[in-house]
Amino acid sequence: MEAFTTHTGIGVPLRQSNVDTDQIIPAVYLKRITRTGFEDALFAAWRKDESFILNQAPFNAGSVLVAGPDFGTGSSREHAVWALKDYGFKAVLSSRFADIFRGNSGKQGLLAAQVAQDDIELIWKVLENHPGTEIKVDLVSKTVECGNVVAPFEIDDYTRWRLLEGLDDIGLTLQHEADITAYEATRPSFKPKTLPAKVQAQ
């Protein structure tokens, strides 16, 4: 997973509250067996409306989503995070996230930054009055900058550390690779062992 320290990109104002995971990615797209290629599924129902924000330039090139409260509610589906990332989003700002969505985001390298609703309102105004304005998201200082708005955001220390280090679940496990190898070396031969990684032919 790529480490996240700072990101600067076009902000996308999504004046919607209670955006659930079925709105982020409809269930029909969950039949796919891959982890990539979900950009077409992001907000699929809403994107049928030509006036939807992601159908308008320059917002269609945005990488920082600024949403209303209670973003990512509903069923737990990692596909919601995959769709946001595949479209090109690096961070989502909201005053409140569903716990499961926030957890899935941190594990997949998408920053879910909790920003006070008053600051979200100010950022929305900047983005709507000046389309194409970029937002700088700084995970080191835990701040966002948009025009003349500078606001702090909240994120738990553990998720922040994982994002800064670029550690997904596999990366965390591989930090203990030497210990795992040493343990398996002492196990009886008839017990299961970790298979070596497959090397693809060039």
UniProtKB/Swiss-Prot annotation:
Pfam families: Aconitase_C (PF00694). Keywords: Amino-acid biosynthesis, Branched-chain amino acid biosynthesis, Leucine biosynthesis, Lyase. One of its GO terms (biological process) is L-leucine biosynthetic process. Pathway: Amino-acid biosynthesis; L-leucine biosynthesis; L-leucine from 3-methyl-2-oxobutanoate: step 2/4. It is an enzyme of class 4 (lyase). Its EC number is 4.2.1.33. Disulfide bonds: none annotated. GO terms for molecular function: 3-isopropylmalate dehydratase activity. GO terms for cellular component: 3-isopropylmalate dehydratase complex. InterPro entries: 3-IsopropMal_deHydase_ssu, Aconitase/3IPM_dehydase_swvl, AconitaseA/IPMdHydase_ssu_swvl, IPMI_Swivel, LeuD. Belongs to the LeuD family. LeuD type 1 subfamily. Heterodimer of LeuC and LeuD. This is 3-isopropylmalate dehydratase small subunit. It comes from Paenarthrobacter aurescens (strain TC1). The lineage of its organism: Bacteria, Bacillati, Actinomycetota, Actinomycetes, Micrococcales.
